[in-house]
């Protein structure tokens, strides 16, 4: 016989429940069996229930009794075991509760409050009882399974090791593993503790040890005091003082090295900044007056340049008066404009003459570059050096046509230099042919 809606087949005999008496059976007829509820069959079937022993239901397996109490509801009251569903004398009550036409949410309120939460696992067999079927059954949720915090007792071994190795507080991998086993800590906790301890030790040394600017005499005095303390104290105190002195000196050496490195870096930065400033100064353009003075007067640092002075004088009637006598003792520069080809020498005097020609009321002629000849003049005699004129067939220059027989005189530029004595001002004269007509 089987109850298909529950999915648990049960025969006439069970391996868990044994009938107390084979003759005591309870069979009732039902107009509609459970298997034919959906098909609405009219054939009748018989539901037979066998009474079970009370010691098998209540004492041996209470879980099985709670699970199977649904099927033995008519006999649960006799065995002092409550049932989840109360059955009447007629089995159609059970069939009506399982009818698909019946709304299940209304019937759920009758047996849902009586359901209890099952345990983490069900040890159906003693050999399988030690295995945890639930994934949280074997996990210990207490603090014993978590990482242990570092306490004062657990860090005592770490402190002892650090005190023994103060000069080199860096444990190896094997020492870390050994300390982790002793203190029951992880390797990460041990490494973190040693890192924090080294930082605290360095901070304490900076605060309590001698400053890094101490001189040699003060160090000698400190070493003498330390030696006296070692002689007066016991052996343990002497060893501790020697270690402290060694640590202090080693730290002072390290600080001196760091100070030297910092000073070297500062000096390098200052020198780089200085070179950059010099480079910027050298790249700055010179002012216009200083640049002009540097170009025009290379022999002196302080130069004064006067303005040119122009004078137009009429030529005398005599033939020898084509030139104006310059001051005795000074050089004379005579400029002659040829009419043939373009001159090869450019000078400041020609530039001034060209500007004067352009400012004349007549048509401005094309500027021609003069050929300059320096004539030294002595007080007793006057020597003239002239450039021969071109052939007579050539036409006169435009400057000669413009000025005729006149002479254009340009007084020299006064050039005064501080380190040298002042020279006489030279006189620059321009000569134009007198035969040309305007």
Curated annotation (Swiss-Prot):
Checking InterPro entries in the record gives: HD, Homeobox_CS, Homeodomain-like_sf, Iroquois_homeo, KN_HD
| Tissue-specific expression | Expressed in a subset of retinal ganglion cells and bipolar cells; including in type 2 and type 3a bipolar cells.
Output the Pfam families linked to this UniProt entry: Homeobox_KN
Compositionally biased spans, kind Acidic residues: 252-268
Q: Name one GO biological process term.
A: retina layer formation
Q: Where is this region: Disordered?
A: 205-270, 388-438
Gene Ontology CC annotation, any one: nucleus
Record localization = Nucleus
Record keywords: DNA-binding, Homeobox, Nucleus
Q: Can you tell me which family this protein belongs to?
A: Belongs to the TALE/IRO homeobox family.
Tell me what this protein is called: Iroquois-class homeodomain protein IRX-6
Give the species this sequence originates from. Answer: Mus musculus
């Amino acid at each position: 016989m089987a109850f298909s809606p529950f999915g648990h087949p049960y025969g006439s005999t069970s391996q868990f429940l044994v009938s107390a008496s084979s003759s005591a059976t309870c069979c009732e007829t039902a107009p509609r069996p459970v298997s034919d509820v959906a098909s609405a069959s009219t054939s009748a079937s018989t539901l037979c229930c066998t009474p079970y022993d009370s010691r098998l239901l209540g004492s041996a397996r209470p879980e099985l009794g709670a699970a199977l109490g649904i099927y033995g509801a008519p006999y649960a009251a006799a065995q002092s075991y409550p049932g989840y569903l109360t059955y009447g004398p007629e089995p159609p009550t059970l069939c009506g509760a399982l009818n698909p036409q019946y709304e299940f949410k209304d019937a759920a309120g009758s047996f849902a409050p009586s359901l209890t939460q099952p345990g983490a696992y069900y040890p159906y067999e003693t050999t399988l009882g030690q295995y945890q079927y639930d994934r949280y059954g074997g996990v210990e949720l207490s603090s014993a399974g978590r990482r242990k915090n570092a306490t004062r007792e657990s860090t005592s071994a770490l402190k002892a090791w650090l005190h023994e190795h103060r000069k080199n507080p860096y444990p190896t991998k094997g020492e870390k593993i050994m300390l982790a086993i002793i203190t029951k800590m992880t390797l990460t906790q041990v490494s973190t503790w040693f890192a924090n301890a080294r930082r605290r030790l360095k901070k304490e040394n900076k605060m309590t040890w001698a400053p890094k600017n101490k001189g040699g005499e003060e160090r000698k005095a400190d070493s003498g005091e330390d030696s006296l303390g070692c002689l007066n104290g016991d052996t343990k105190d002497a060893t501790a003082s020697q270690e402290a002195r060694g640590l202090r000196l080693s730290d002072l050496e390290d600080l001196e090295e760091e100070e030297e490195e910092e000073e070297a870096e500062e000096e390098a930065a200052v020198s780089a900044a200085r070179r950059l400033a010099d480079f910027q100064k050298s790249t700055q353009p010179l002012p216009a007056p200083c640049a002009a003075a540097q170009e025009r007067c290379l022999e002196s640092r302080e130069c004064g340049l006067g303005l040119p002075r122009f004078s137009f004088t009429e030529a005398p009637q005599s033939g020898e008066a084509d030139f104006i006598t310059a001051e005795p003792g000074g050089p004379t520069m005579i400029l002659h404009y040829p009419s043939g080809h373009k001159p090869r020498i450019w000078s400041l005097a020609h530039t001034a003459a060209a500007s004067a020609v352009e400012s004349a009321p007549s048509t401005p002629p094309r500027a021609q570059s003069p050929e300059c000849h320096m004539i030294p003049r002595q007080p007793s005699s006057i020597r003239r050096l002239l450039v021969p004129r071109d052939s007579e067939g050539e036409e006169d220059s435009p400057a000669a046509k413009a000025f005729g027989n006149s002479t254009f005189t340009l007084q020299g530029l006064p050039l005064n230099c501080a380190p040298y004595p002042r020279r006489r001002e030279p006189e620059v004269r321009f000569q134009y042919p007198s035969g040309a007509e305007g």
